[in-house]
UniProtKB/Swiss-Prot annotation:
GO molecular function: GTP binding; GTPase activity; ribosome binding
Transmembrane segments: none
Entry protein name: Elongation factor 4
EC number: 3.6.5.n1
GO CC aspect terms: plasma membrane
Membrane topology field: Peripheral membrane protein
Sequence similarity: Belongs to the TRAFAC class translation factor GTPase superfamily. Classic translation factor GTPase family. LepA subfamily.
Entries under CDD domains matching the protein: EF4_II, EF4_III, LepA, lepA_C
GO BP of this protein: positive regulation of translation; translation
InterPro entries given in the database record: EF-4, EFG_III/V, EFG_V-like, EFTu-like_2, G_TR_CS, GUFP, LepA_C_sf, LepA_CTD
Biological role: Required for accurate and efficient protein synthesis under certain stress conditions. May act as a fidelity factor of the translation reaction, by catalyzing a one-codon backward translocation of tRNAs on improperly translocated ribosomes. Back-translocation proceeds from a post-translocation (POST) complex to a pre-translocation (PRE) complex, thus giving elongation factor G a second chance to translocate the tRNAs correctly. Binds to ribosomes in a GTP-dependent manner.
Organism of this sequence: Gloeothece citriformis (strain PCC 7424) (Cyanothece sp. (strain PCC 7424))
Length: 604
C-alpha cells in the first residue's frame, strides 16, 4: 500500500474511562499530524453516532491512519484503533487491543484511576502491549498530577517517572505523546511472507456496499480481488474494495502485515463478519485462526412492545436494520396478553439495552414500552434436562423443576473511602458476597464482591452513583452459575395473571417485592365500576393483596325517608349489576404500571 516499511508502522489504542478525554485527544492527534484539516474538524471526530456525542461515550469502534514525520526526520504510519470504554463492550475492547502493539493509558489528572480503566489495562497487559501513561486535563484547576501519578504506580504498577502531562483540549503535550508512540511502541512483526491472517476488530453495515469490515493484517498480504475465507463463519467472499481509514476511507490495492484497513465484499449482515474472526485466503488458508474469538452472548433480556399495535411491523424492520450493525443484538417475536405483539430482545448489558432502545425511539420514531430486564436462568427439570430461561413466563411449574441457577458476576468497585459503608450496604441488599477490600491510596479503596447478575441489571449503577455522589466506578465480569432459592412471582389483576409483570425473585425477597408492587399498582390502576383485586402469588399461594374500591353511583339519592325495603331493593340491584360487570369486565392496566416494576427496585 505504502512505501513505509513494517519497522515504521505503529499500531496503538487509547485506554481511558468515560469522560477522561480520549476522543478529544484523538481529535488533537488527527489535527497535529495533518490527517484532518482544521476546517473540517469537529468535536469528537471519531464518534459517528449522535448518541455517542451526546452521552460522551464511544460505542462503535473507529480507526484512523496518521502519517507522522518524527523529530528524527523519518516518516511513520501511526494507526489509532479506538476502543469503547464501557463495561458492556469489553469483548470489543479485547479484540481491538489484540490488533495493537501499544496503548496510551489516559487518566484524568483531577479524577484518578477508575475501575473500568483498570479492567482494560489488565486486558492490554494480557495482550502484551507496551503501555504509555498519560495524565490528561492538567489545565484544570482541580488537577493533582503528582497524586494521580502515584496512584497509577500503586494501582497499575507502571513506572510513572516519565509520565506525559497533557491537556488534549489545549493541545499541550500532544507532540510528546506522538514522539513516545514512535519510540516506545514496538513495530509489528514482519511476517509478510506467511499465509494471510487478519483480525476483524469492527464492522458496520453500508446500504450500498454491504458490510464494511475493519481489520488488522497480522501475517501475509491481502490484495483487492482476493477470495477470502472467514474462519469462524466458514464463508467465502471476494474483496471488491480494499482501503485504509484516514479516518475517511481511501482505496488501495494491497495491504501487508502490520497494516490496518477496511474491505467490502458484498457481505449481507454483520453476523457473517463477527468481531474477532480471522480472515485468510480461500485458495491457501492459514493452518489455524488467530486466538481469542468468542460468540457474543446476550446477558440481559427484556420485552419491547410498541404502544400502538400498528407499529409492530415498523418495530420489526427497525430491529432488523439495527441488527445489521450490531451482531450482539438478538430478538424474537413475543406475544403478551397485556401488551399484544412485540419482541423479546437480548443485549450484552444494561448500557447496550438503553442505547438500542434510545436508537429505536430516536432514529425510527417508535414509541415503546419495555418490560423489566431479566437475565438467563438455568433450570434443571425433573426429566434431568437443563433449559435456559430468559422470560419468567417460560419457567416450568414448581413440580416439574429440581433447581434454578442464576448467573453471578465478579464485581470490582473503586470508591473514595468515605463511601465504603454505603456501597457495602448496597451490595448486601443485593445479595452480594463480600470477597476482598484493598486500599490503594489514603483516599481510594477497591471493594470486590460477587453478586447475582439479576440484582445489578435494573438500577445498580444508578444507585452506585447516587450513593457515592458520582465518585465510584464499577467493572464486572461473569463467573458462572449458582443455585439459589428462586421463585416466580405472578401478579394477578382481577383474577387474571398479567404476564408482563411476572418476575423471578429470591424467595426471601418475594414478600417485600410482592407487597410493594401490589401497593404501587393500586395507586396506578384507575378505579372501575367494580371492585378490582390485585394479588401477588407464588404458584397458587397469594402472598400479598390489595384491592381498588369500585366507583359507585348513589342509587339512594331519590329515596327520602320511607321504606327500608325500597332502599335494599335498589342496593341489591346495584350489587347484582356490579357482580355481572365484574365477571365480564376487563381491567385496563396503564403503561405507568409496567414502568413501576422498573422503578420498584430503587425502594426495595
Amino acid at each position: 500500500m505504502t512505501d513505509v516499511p513494517v519497522s515504521r508502522i505503529r499500531n496503538f489504542s487509547i485506554i481511558a474511562h468515560i469522560d477522561h478525554g480520549k476522543s478529544t485527544l484523538a481529535d488533537r492527534m488527527l489535527q497535529m499530524t495533518g490527517t484532518v484539516e482544521d476546517r473540517k474538524m469537529k468535536e469528537q471526530f471519531l464518534d459517528n453516532l449522535d448518541l455517542e456525542r451526546e452521552r460522551g461515550i464511544t460505542i462503535k469502534l473507529q480507526a484512523a491512519r496518521m502519517n507522522y514525520t518524527a523529530q528524527d526526520g523519518q516518516h511513520y504510519v501511526l494507526n489509532l484503533i479506538d476502543t469503547p470504554g464501557h463495561v458492556d463492550f469489553s469483548y470489543e475492547v479485547s479484540r481491538s487491543l489484540a490488533a495493537c502493539e501499544g496503548a496510551l493509558l489516559v487518566v484524568d489528572a483531577s479524577q484518578g484511576v477508575e475501575a473500568q480503566t483498570l479492567a482494560n489495562v489488565y486486558l492490554a497487559l494480557e495482550n502484551n502491549l507496551e503501555i504509555i501513561p498519560v495524565l490528561n486535563k492538567i489545565d484544570l484547576p482541580g488537577a493533582e498530577p503528582e497524586r494521580v501519578a502515584q496512584e497509577i504506580e500503586e494501582i497499575v504498577g507502571l513506572d510513572c517517572s516519565g509520565i506525559i502531562k497533557a491537556s488534549a483540549k489545549e493541545g499541550i503535550g500532544v507532540n510528546e505523546i506522538l514522539e513516545s508512540i514512535v519510540h516506545l511502541v514496538p513495530p509489528p512483526d514482519d511476517t509478510t511472507n506467511k499465509p494471510l491472517r487478519a483480525l476483524i476488530f469492527d464492522s458496520y453495515y453500508d446500504s450500498y456496499r454491504g458490510v464494511v469490515v475493519y481489520f488488522r493484517v497480522m501475517d501475509g498480504t491481502v490484495k483487492k480481488g482476493d477470495r477470502v475465507l472467514l474462519m469462524a463463519s466458514g464463508k467465502e467472499y471476494e474483496i471488491d474494495e480494499l482501503g485504509v481509514l484516514s479516518p475517511h476511507q481511501i482505496q488501495v490495492d494491497e495491504l501487508h502485515a502490520g497494516e490496518v484497513g477496511y474491505f467490502a465484499a458484498a457481505i449481507k449482515t454483520v453476523e457473517d463478519a463477527r468481531v474477532g474472526d480471522t480472515i485468510t485466503l480461500a485458495p491457501k488458508p492459514a493452518d489455524e485462526p488467530l486466538p481469542g474469538y468468542k460468540e457474543a452472548k446476550p446477558m440481559v433480556f427484556c420485552g419491547l412492545f410498541p404502544t400502538d399495535s400498528d407499529q409492530y411491523e415498523d418495530l420489526r424492520d427497525a430491529l432488523h436494520k439495527l441488527k445489521l450493525n450490531d451482531a450482539a443484538l438478538n430478538f424474537e417475536p413475543e406475544t403478551s396478553t397485556a401488551m399484544g405483539f412485540g419482541f423479546r430482545c437480548g443485549f450484552l448489558g444494561l448500557l447496550h439495552m438503553e442505547i438500542v432502545q434510545e436508537r429505536l425511539e430516536r432514529e425510527y420514531d417508535l414509541d415503546l414500552i419495555t418490560t423489566a430486564p431479566s437475565v438467563v436462568y438455568r433450570v434443571t427439570t425433573t426429566e434431568e434436562e437443563v433449559i435456559e430461561v430468559d422470560n419468567p413466563s417460560q419457567l416450568p411449574p414448581p413440580q416439574k423443576r429440581i433447581k434454578i441457577e442464576e448467573p453471578y458476576v465478579h464485581m470490582e468497585m473503586i470508591t473514595p473511602e468515605t463511601y465504603v459503608g454505603a456501597l457495602m450496604e448496597l451490595c448486601q441488599n443485593r445479595r452480594g458476597e463480600f470477597k476482598d477490600m484493598r486500599y490503594f491510596t489514603q483516599t481510594r479503596t477497591a471493594l470486590v464482591y460477587e453478586l447475582p447478575l439479576a440484582e445489578i441489571v435494573t438500577d445498580f449503577f444508578d444507585q452506585l452513583k447516587s450513593r457515592t455522589r458520582g465518585y465510584a466506578s464499577m467493572e464486572y465480569h461473569l463467573i458462572g452459575y449458582r443455585e439459589n432459592a428462586l421463585v416466580k412471582l405472578d401478579i394477578m389483576v382481577n383474577g387474571d395473571g398479567v404476564d408482563a409483570l411476572a418476575m423471578i425473585v429470591h424467595r426471601d425477597k418475594a414478600y417485600n417485592v410482592g407487597r410493594a408492587l401490589t401497593e404501587k399498582l393500586k395507586e396506578l390502576i384507575p378505579r372501575h365500576q367494580f371492585k378490582v383485586p390485585i394479588q401477588a402469588a407464588i404458584g397458587s399461594k397469594v402472598i400479598a393483596s390489595e384491592h381498588i374500591p369500585a366507583l359507585r353511583k348513589d342509587v339512594l339519592a331519590k329515596c327520602y325517608g320511607g321504606d327500608i325495603t325500597r332502599k335494599k331493593k335498589l342496593l341489591e340491584k346495584q350489587a347484582k349489576g356490579k357482580k355481572r360487570m365484574k365477571s365480564i369486565g376487563t381491567v385496563d392496566v396503564p403503561q405507568e404500571a409496567f414502568m413501576a416494576v422498573l422503578r420498584l427496585n430503587n425502594e426495595s
